[in-house]
Amino acid sequence: MTHILDDLSFRGLIQQQTDEAGLRELLDKEKISLYSGFDPTADSLHIGHLLPILMLRRFQLAGHRPIALVGGATGLIGDPSGKKAERTLNNEEIVREWSQKIKNQLSRFLDFEAEENPAIMANNYDWIGKMNVIDFLRDVGKNFGINYMLAKDTVSSRIETGISYTEFSYMILQSLDFLNLYRNQECKLQIGGSDQWGNITSGLELIRKSEENAKAFGLTIPLVTKADGTKFGKTEGGAIWLDKEKTSAYEFYQFWINTDDRDVVKYLKYFTFLSKEEIEDLAEKTETAPEKREAQKRLAEEVTVLVHGREAFEQAVNISKALFSGDIKQLTAEEVKVGFKGVPSLEVEKADELPLVEILVQSKLSPSKRQAREDITNGAVYVNGERRTDVADVLTADDRIEGQFTVIRRGKKKYFLLTYK
């Protein structure tokens, strides 16, 4: 079996390590506990969180015990890492609600019922929330020199623009997390994004000062980049969320299927559990026959199934095929709802007579009745994927998909959705 560190190295998943030889020796001798933290800054995790989540999963598959730490306390403070300005503070009730949602999402990726190495879910509010300010300053704060903290990138990058004491103290709170998990869960490794290096090394320093003969390690993963220079995980519609109510499985699938040839092999290494041989085979196919997009198809399948399940993946493929071929009628009402999310729509009475010309004008697909008639005559108008060329056409019950939707298209890309009361 490939050593976990060798597998991570092949995948390009190690940005920095505090002590590579020491960590390798530890992993050779014993199964360890490790953690990564997730602050509830929204009501869902997004694909930027996938790498650390999958890192925990990789270690669990290798026999180690992952700890997913939800930042119920640190989420109330705000991490300055990578931020140019102060975060807006959220209230306790919202953070508690978001923490629960994130817990539920994490349970889809980690096995909390495993016999030998079940994952652990922790919330740092359980220890930070109970600590009074005197204990915090005497027992924890005294271990941190101001010059040491000012030298950290997360702080130094904000000195000119300004940083509050609240965010300045975030590093200490995260360090306290590592110390608490080290003491109570024998956690010896923290994993985080490359922007967390300063916070991780601060935690190691606190452990070293607080515990005799301490052995603890830190490892960061790279920032995910795109070859075209745009930000990974963002589209015109915003962030790609792991919650299907915020980003549908179809939208999620489309994000991955549209991966640039220059990025696809890297993402296969980062986001899938395919073997080295399978990835190298897909890399060769991308090189020799890029038009077939086999690597993109496999990437989209692996990640969509991982996040949303096999059924949602198959639905996403079905929607994609229907939209590509124009065969809208073969979609179910649920698939239409998912596939045309965000498309302009109009709700009408089922009993209404709906002349196609009037619908084109009401929907603003055509600017006038005259233009609408011209569009129909020229064969530019489609109802559920079927071309309509009769200007006297009236939409009937037969044009409703499961009685709920009619999809109107003008030209190649202008869609409109009719829904029925």
Curated annotation (Swiss-Prot):
A motif ('HIGH' region) lies at residues 40-49. L-tyrosine binds at residues 35, 170, 174. Signal peptide: none annotated. Pfam families: SYY_C-terminal, tRNA-synt_1b. Residues 354-420 form the S4 RNA-binding domain. InterPro entries: aa-tRNA-synth_I_CS, aa-tRNA-synth_Ic, Rossmann-like_a/b/a_fold, S4_RNA-bd, S4_RNA-bd_sf, SYY-like_C, Tyr-tRNA-ligase, Tyr-tRNA-ligase_bac-type. It comes from the Bacteria. Keywords: Aminoacyl-tRNA synthetase, ATP-binding, Cytoplasm, Ligase, Nucleotide-binding, Protein biosynthesis, RNA-binding. This is Tyrosine--tRNA ligase 1.
